[in-house]
Amino acid sequence: MHTFLIVLLIIDCIALITVVLLQEGKSSGLSGAISGGAEQLFGKQKQRGVDLFLNRLTIILSILFFVLMICISYLGM
């Protein structure tokens, strides 16, 4: 059981890294807020399509990561 959870954790880590790297970068970061890009920073920006899917998948994989880590820690005691 412990080995199975570790294999799942490795798969989850690889998937999480891949999904994060596939996401589109936010072009107006701190420099955009300072230099007058505040309307883009504070305005409503809806995510659509692939961006929305990748964002939700990142959240799901992150939750799975923490659940697997807690289970592995619990079984290790």
From Swiss-Prot:
It comes from the Bacteria. It is a multi-pass membrane protein. The chain crosses the membrane at residues 2-22, 57-77. The keyword tRNA-binding does not apply. Keywords: Cell membrane, Membrane, Protein transport, Translocation, Transmembrane, Transmembrane helix, Transport. InterPro entries: SecG. One of its GO terms (biological process) is intracellular protein transmembrane transport. GO terms for cellular component: plasma membrane. Its main location: membrane. One of its GO terms (molecular function) is protein-transporting ATPase activity. It is found in: Cell membrane. Belongs to the SecG family. Involved in protein export. Participates in an early event of protein translocation. This is Probable protein-export membrane protein SecG. The lineage of its organism: Bacteria, Bacillati, Bacillota, Bacilli, Bacillales.
